[in-house]
A protein has these predicted regions:
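A cross-kingdom signal targeting lumenal/periplasmic-facing segments of multi-pass membrane
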Residues: 1-36, 66-73
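Active-site-proximal, structured, solvent-exposed surfaces of multi-pass membrane proteins
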Residues: 6, 52-182
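Short, cationic low-complexity segments
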Residues: 32-51, 169
């Protein structure tokens, strides 16, 4: 349900079963329960309703500016664009709320933005992404921008530039030699 599994395939011969309890690509919870560590997080998940409550490791407490906020029927969040390295959501909220995203939390390279401004995100329910979204209408974006990729691109650009300079030098040297011999 947390990972938005919409269909369950029991056997190849049978029709897939629809999972009516899948929570969707993202949803708002009414409260967050802070726990001491990952082990406590795993234990606490068994005791909550993930549609209304999230479990958060205490080391992410500084990013959790809202711990409890009752829901509103008008609050919505939708996935509007999905690419492997870019996820875009549209959200409308009547108050600051905690959003849980049905995506695996991986802090190395994933950056979060609200209206193109950097925003913090944290691990919730042991494996998912969570974020406090402020009141109002917002575009939320998650971009995969790993440092290793950027560093590799810079090294490739430098290497290609050096190679190009060497090729130009060799071509100019050959041209000079040819002109002297003629």
């Amino acid at each position: 349900n947390l990972l938005n599994t919409r269909y369950i395939i029991v056997s190849p011969e049978a029709l897939p079963l629809q999972n009516r309890f899948a929570l969707g690509n993202a949803w708002f919870v009414e409260r967050a329960t802070l726990v001491e560590n990952a082990d406590a997080e795993l234990l606490a998940i068994k005791t909550i309703d993930p549609a209304t409550e999230a479990v958060v490791d205490r080391r992410f407490a500084d990013q959790l500016t809202v711990v409890e906020q009752p829901g509103s029927e008008t609050d919505t969040i939708y996935l509007t664009s999905y690419r492997p390295n870019l996820l875009t959501y549209e959200a409308r909220l009547s108050a600051d709320r905690i959003a849980v995203f049905s995506e695996i939390y991986y802090p190395y390279g994933w950056n979060a933005f609200i209206d193109d401004k950097p925003a913090g995100h944290f691990r919730t329910d042991y494996v998912l992404r969570g974020m406090v979204v402020p009141e109002g209408t917002h575009t939320i974006t998650f971009r995969f921008e790993p440092r290793s990729y950027k560093t590799g691109n810079r090294i490739s650009l430098a290497g290609s530039s050096i190679l190009l300079i060497m090729l130009l030098y060799a071509a100019l040297s050959a041209l000079k030699t040819r002109r002297k011999n003629v």
